């Protein structure tokens, strides 16, 4: 709903990786935190500790520039073919440690759709991609049997849109 309200979409894992590798992005390395006994991974304490660490990392990058993308500090909730084939699961990908190692390869099996913890983020992207000089709506690219590969790394057309179901 938030993405829809802003006219945006969640990225695919392939897009998150491209953002990570793009020139000019600001890299704030991921730092993991463990819950205390009896605490869950979505606790306020873990979120605050993670946020403080991210703020510390940002302060070391010089003056704030709102035109630069900050990445690597969180795992992304992503979309892709999983949302069509496994609608009850949430796909998580990314986060990079300061040494460049990835935190989470694409995981499409282990987390129910309601899963949430301090280390995730919902990065929003514009719902258009430039292909051969033409702007394409992402929903059309997902359904295209050839161009879908650009977003997902997989060939063949989908039978539906990769998005998370709305629970009201």
Regions found by a protein language model. Give the residues of each.
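Soluble non-cytosolic domains of exported or imported proteins
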Residues: 1, 10, 115-119
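Generic preference for well-ordered secondary structure
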Residues: 3-4, 108, 152
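Extracellular C-type lectin-like domains
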Residues: 53-118
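Conserved hydrophobic ligand-interaction patch in extracellular adhesion modules
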Residues: 2-65, 124
């Amino acid at each position: 709903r938030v993405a829809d309200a802003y006219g945006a979409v969640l990225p695919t894992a392939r897009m998150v990786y491209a953002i990570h590798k793009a020139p000019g992005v600001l890299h704030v390395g991921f730092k993991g935190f463990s819950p205390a006994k009896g605490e869950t991974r979505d606790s306020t304490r873990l979120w605050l500790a993670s946020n403080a660490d991210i703020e510390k990392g940002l302060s070391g990058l010089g003056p704030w520039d709102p035109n630069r993308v900050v990445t690597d500090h969180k795992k992304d909730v992503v979309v892709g073919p999983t949302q069509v084939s496994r609608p009850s699961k949430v796909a998580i990908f990314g986060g990079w440690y300061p040494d460049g190692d990835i935190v989470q390869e694409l995981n499409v099996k282990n987390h129910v759709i309601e899963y949430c913890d301090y280390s995730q983020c919902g990065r929003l992207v514009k719902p258009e991609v430039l292909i051969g000089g033409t702007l394409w709506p992402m929903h059309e690219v997902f359904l295209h049997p050839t161009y879908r590969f650009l977003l997902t790394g997989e060939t063949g057309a989908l039978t539906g849109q990769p998005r998370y179901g709305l629970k009201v």
